[in-house]
Structures are given as structure tokens and as C-alpha cells.
Amino acid sequence: MKKHLLPLALLLSGISPAQALDVGDISSFMNSDSSTLSKTIKNSTDSGRLINIRLERLSSPLDDGQVIAMDKPDELLLTPASLLLPAQASEVIRFFYKGPADEKERYYRIVWFDQALSDAQRDNANRSAVATASARIGTILVVAPRQANYHFQYANGSLTNTGNATLRILAYGPCLKAANGKECKENYYLMPGKSRRFTRVDTADNKGRVALWQGDKFIPVK
């Protein structure tokens, strides 16, 4: 598939990906029965970092998603939005959803601006911390509908999400092609209205298994 759900945008200037701030999972999910979510970020480098965080609502988490207006200014809040993170330190960032309690799934981009700090001599008597390298990291937050309807259809190795909330789907068992080995596994996120065919696992085999997650609930399909 050309379009992948939940892409990561990592634009760097003067810093390599290995040195960038560790923001955890590329994609995060806030289930329908929760209005808060926490993400732990870590500075694994040997210098302090200045972190600024911004939120954008997206029409879709796919490659063609566009930034759109939020339904209200305080739809999604976070704290802290700016912090100084010492070397080898961690911090918990908390997100709070205060938007409409309807049947619509919402997508947000969390933009992390990460700047490394070092001491720079301004004059003989004064030293100050200045940014010496920077990175812009984008991750995705999916807020499930407050009124979630989980429905799906499965036939001939293909799953269709007929509900209104993204599903995490998986298949495991004998490989469809011998070249891939004996046992294979596939994991995908399936948005509402989308279908996905498993291409590595032989789901027609009696030992082939298909399952999915509806929020925190595990559902065997085959």
C-alpha cells in the first residue's frame, strides 16, 4: 500500500535521528472510555534539551491528511507544553481530550520541537544556554469516538472495518510463501471504512489465526 496509517515525520537539522529526543511510540491511542493519555519522553543524550510541543488536528493520519481546525480551542490540551529536559532524564507529557462526545474519530499530530543546549560564552562575565542543534518530530494521536461502534467483516483473508473506530488487526500462523519461512505474523491498524488483506500469513490454513483489538478488548476472528 502506498499510504500507510500513522506515518512519522522526522525532519532534522544538524542532528542525526539516533541523537533525537525519544518520544516513544509513533502512534498513540486514546480509547473511547478515557479522556487522558500520558507519553513518556526521554533525553538519552549527554546534554540538556529544550522541548516545545504543539498540537495540530488532521483530516486523516494517512499521507494525504491535511491540517484542519479544531472544533473548539480547548479540544485537546497538554501539559507541560514547554520544558528543559536534563541529560539522561525523562518526563511525562499528559494529554486531555475535551472535545465533542460524538461518533467521530479524531486525529492529531503531536509536533515535538527538540533543541540541544550547550553553554556559550556571551562575554567574560555571562554565560547562557543556547540551542546548537534541533529536530522536528511528528507523531500521531488517535482519539477514538466517545460513542464507539466496533463492527467488522472478515472473508477470504480480508478484514473490513465497518465501524467508526480504528482497529488493530493481526494474523499469525503458517506463512503463505515458503520463502518467508514457516511461521509468519502481520499487524496493521485498520481505519473505519478501510479493508486489509493479509499477504504473508496463510489464513486459509487450519492453523492460521486472525484476531483484532477493539480498544483494550482482544477479539478472536478465526
Swiss-Prot record:
Keywords assigned: Chaperone, Fimbrium biogenesis, Signal
Annotated protein name in UniProt: Probable fimbrial chaperone EcpB
Pfam families found in the cross-reference section: EcpB_C
Function: Part of the ecpRABCDE operon, which encodes the E.coli common pilus (ECP). ECP is found in both commensal and pathogenic strains and plays a dual role in early-stage biofilm development and host cell recognition.
Taxonomy, superkingdom: Bacteria
Organism annotation: Escherichia coli O7:K1 (strain IAI39 / ExPEC)
Signal peptide extent: 1-20
Induction, as annotated: Negatively regulated by H-NS. Positively regulated by IHF and EcpR.
Keyword Transmembrane helix applies: no
